[in-house]
């Protein structure tokens, strides 16, 4: 029953893109469809059921295409320097700027976070399958990984901004709390200057990938 429900939901999602309506055109629609397919992919690829996994692997390429579409509408914080040496200055500088509209920032950050989380998941899945570590497809897999991570994917590490419940809370956190612009998995500056209280759920997941689960817990506890 669960398998049928998932299969039907995915088919409904894909039919909206291939039907006569022309598919998603607005940025919010592109974000919604990508997040929906991403969640279905997590279920199908990690469930352990052979049929679900085969269906999920069939749609990996489609998820990548939709992620590329999201990259085209993403505000990638290009005004900030990518090097870690400029991160502290940029954080202070941004706090001195007038904060963006709360709803606008939430949408833009959702796009940025969806992109880096989905790409990270797809790479992790390939690693779990053994690609890139001696299999016959290792060269192709490594080329794909370089293609994804050759691009700069920036996102904002700040629990205070991400968990703000109102425009007032957001503006106050923007002015009073540090927020760190992370490029891909470049956490060095944050680990030197950030605090455990800055870490939200996504940041904890990505930090765990970067430095290990226990090390991340220790950092959050020690620097809170």
Which residues does each predicted region cover?
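C-terminal effector modules of eukaryotic transcription factors
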Residues: 2-10, 51-224
